[in-house]
């Protein structure tokens, strides 16, 4: 190597290292901004969990009282688990039924324009997807839904699913902190969730997105004459900003356009990318931090924050360096990283932190084509799905993390020979049984359908990638549906009756079966008397318990899928590594 070649090599490596450092800094900036805003919001959420008045109560209190009088409910009417869950199910069922009929007959309703429509299986999948806060979209054409369907059904279900999730978390927290024998009133909790938390934040975000250039109109499309091709194109418009706001605030994730946040009308630049990331992280993160205020132990909230941040930072850096390294054997991204399927205005670091944030939470939004990620990059994104979204969605994150906490307290107490207790409440066999059922249900909902699908030849013929990639794509599809995430990797034709109905069933079970287990635990806690304040068998707020909690999440959440991970993304990763070794030899 002569001097000129050496100098060129040196500067190439220097700029690569510089971009790597800047990428890590960008990821940390995203997390710091989200953490600061979540900390501020946590005080507001704590008041909601404690059934106290908030800054919006003077206005929203009258609205909530009006709706309660209209339906004949009162916050003083406490419900047991059975009453609470049945009312939750009936409310969601009738909302889903009405939504299904609206989409089925949308061509006869206002603002239908040139709507293509949906098949019954796709209609079922779409309604269930948005009803369960999953937002898994097996369609990509915005013309399949009319503006009336987008506004009345899609946006409406986004509010409903987010409100239902947070109401369930209010019931769970109430079951732990009170001993009244009931877990609250579902309709009151739902209305408080909507009017005191979700709606105000959605309005604020909508204004920000409109000012940032995201369209908000009832105009169907604009006609553009392409200068180079001399062709006429119709570019769909619509009430994008409104849907985009609740999509992120409600951790829904379903986009107005098929490309989701990779489409410039949904996410035009770095500013909207940052705003949307913060907006779908802020409520789940603030909810966990607020638990320290609710239970009178700030260290408990900080412990939960750092547990979640461990997975957040690890997954983000793993995915970033996996994408930044590219695939050298294919000369893919040797200097620039793997930019395939990513927006040049956003880049690798902002794409990966967005994707990881969407799977650590239950949002599932995407600003890049996940099918074009490297095997290492997709592992970083996939970890969140396999852990059933550690940060969770609006409300559901609190439910999910407590299942791990109860299990960890039980194991840790056995290790030191003490009785398991949490928040001064004795953990009995009933809580252990239902928390364990909750933790093992998710892997079963993923592994069983995956094995069945692999044995059906005509379904596998729709895949375009090699065998190991097919396993990864199926694992991603079913993990996304079962965890109510909605993130889509693609790589095969998802709009088939088999996948539409199967994913629909997985979404329903992943949402309501787990929620039933969790509310049963809340009911069980609600009849127990707490011991003296701050008395516990083991300290659940120190760093040692945090490490045990991380270990439990890894052992239960990830090892359940280890054989599939080996046959899927790890095999693809090793295959790339072997090719590199052969090239070197």
Swiss-Prot record:
Gene Ontology CC annotations of this record: plasma membrane
Alphabetized UniProt keyword annotations: Cell membrane, Ion transport, Membrane, Potassium, Potassium transport, Transmembrane, Transmembrane helix, Transport
Give the stretches traversing the membrane.
23-43, 85-105, 152-172, 194-214, 275-295, 307-327, 345-365, 367-387, 397-417, 444-464, 502-522, 547-567
A single GO molecular function, which one? P-type potassium transmembrane transporter activity
Note one Pfam family from the annotation: KdpA
Specify the protein's topology with respect to the membrane: Multi-pass membrane protein
Q: Which HAMAP family match?
A: KdpA
Q: What does this protein do?
A: Part of the high-affinity ATP-driven potassium transport (or Kdp) system, which catalyzes the hydrolysis of ATP coupled with the electrogenic transport of potassium into the cytoplasm. This subunit binds the extracellular potassium ions and delivers the ions to the membrane domain of KdpB through an intramembrane tunnel.
Subunit relationships = The system is composed of three essential subunits: KdpA, KdpB and KdpC.
- Name the family the entry cites: Belongs to the KdpA family.
Q: What is this protein called?
A: Potassium-transporting ATPase potassium-binding subunit
Q: Which organism is it from?
A: Thermoplasma acidophilum (strain ATCC 25905 / DSM 1728 / JCM 9062 / NBRC 15155 / AMRC-C165)
Query: Which gene name belongs to this protein?
Result: kdpA
